[in-house]
Amino acid sequence: MSPQTETKASVGFKAGVKDYKLTYYTPDYVTKDTDILAAFRVSPQPGVPPEEAG
């Protein structure tokens, strides 16, 4: 039988939905030579903002 360990859910992760602009969008990002450009066509479901669909 393996020893039990204590897990704290509040360390490093909080459940919930965050605004896309606050978590992923970085307007001042400077591209590098090693960056890869990929393009995808996304169609949001009714009631979902386009920026949240991707």
Swiss-Prot record:
Give all N6,N6,N6-trimethyllysine modified positions.
K14
This protein's record includes keyword Transcription: no
Query: Which UniProt keywords are given for this protein, alphabetically ordered?
Result: Acetylation, Calvin cycle, Carbon dioxide fixation, Chloroplast, Lyase, Methylation, Monooxygenase, Oxidoreductase, Photorespiration, Photosynthesis, Plastid
Q: Does the keyword Iron-sulfur apply?
A: no
Localization per Swiss-Prot or TrEMBL: Plastid, Chloroplast
User: What processes does the entry annotate via GO biological process terms?
Assistant: photorespiration; reductive pentose-phosphate cycle
Indicate where the modification N-acetylproline is found in the sequence.
P3
**What Pfam family does this protein match (any one)?**
RuBisCO_large_N
- Look up the EC number in the record and give it: 4.1.1.39
Q: What is its main location?
A: plastid
Which InterPro entries does the annotation name? Answer: RuBisCO (IPR033966), RuBisCO_lsu_fd_N (IPR017443), RuBisCO_lsu_N_sf (IPR036422)
Give the Gene3D superfamilies listed for this entry.
RuBisCO large subunit, N-terminal domain
The propeptide sits at: 1-2
**Annotated Gene Ontology cellular component terms:** chloroplast
What are the recorded GO MF terms, alphabetically?
monooxygenase activity; ribulose-bisphosphate carboxylase activity
Catalytic activity reads: 2 (2R)-3-phosphoglycerate + 2 H(+) = D-ribulose 1,5-bisphosphate + CO2 + H2O; D-ribulose 1,5-bisphosphate + O2 = 2-phosphoglycolate + (2R)-3-phosphoglycerate + 2 H(+)
Belongs to which family?
Answer: Belongs to the RuBisCO large chain family. Type I subfamily.
Report the PANTHER family cross-referenced here: RIBULOSE BISPHOSPHATE CARBOXYLASE, RIBULOSE BISPHOSPHATE CARBOXYLASE LARGE CHAIN
- What function does this protein fulfil? RuBisCO catalyzes two reactions: the carboxylation of D-ribulose 1,5-bisphosphate, the primary event in carbon dioxide fixation, as well as the oxidative fragmentation of the pentose substrate in the photorespiration process. Both reactions occur simultaneously and in competition at the same active site.
**Miscellaneous comment in the UniProt entry for this protein:** The basic functional RuBisCO is composed of a large chain homodimer in a 'head-to-tail' conformation. In form I RuBisCO this homodimer is arranged in a barrel-like tetramer with the small subunits forming a tetrameric 'cap' on each end of the 'barrel'.
**Subunit annotation:** Heterohexadecamer of 8 large chains and 8 small chains.
Write the protein's name: Ribulose bisphosphate carboxylase large chain
The species is Ilex aquifolium (English holly)
Provide the gene name from the record: rbcL
